Amino acid sequence: MKNGTVKWFNADKGFGFITGEDGTDVFVHFSAIQTDGFKTLDEGQKVTYDEEQGDRGPQATNVQPQ
């Protein structure tokens, strides 16, 4: 698991970006957020996540808000 901070997240569109500890921006889709109910993230929120290589670059999976 990696640690990061939510750079921005658009709840209407269901995606955003996490900035990893190494400064890399990682795409995050709402379906990767491991919470019950409405899946959204807040700017500046701390998260842990796994990372995989997507079609357009790094993508977060198994995102867990802290």
Curated annotation (Swiss-Prot):
Record GO terms (molecular function): DNA binding
Main location: cytoplasm
Signal peptide, first to last residue: none
Residues spanning the membrane: none
Entry-linked Pfam families: CSD
UniProt keyword list: Activator, Cytoplasm, DNA-binding, Stress response, Transcription, Transcription regulation
Superkingdom assignment: Bacteria
Inducers of expression: In response to low temperature.
PROSITE patterns hit by this protein: CSD_1, CSD_2
GO cellular component assignments: cytoplasm
Location of the protein in the cell: Cytoplasm
All residue ranges annotated as the CSD domain in the record: 4-63
Identification of the protein by name: Cold shock protein 2
Species this protein is from: Lactiplantibacillus plantarum (strain ATCC BAA-793 / NCIMB 8826 / WCFS1)
Gene name of this polypeptide: cspL
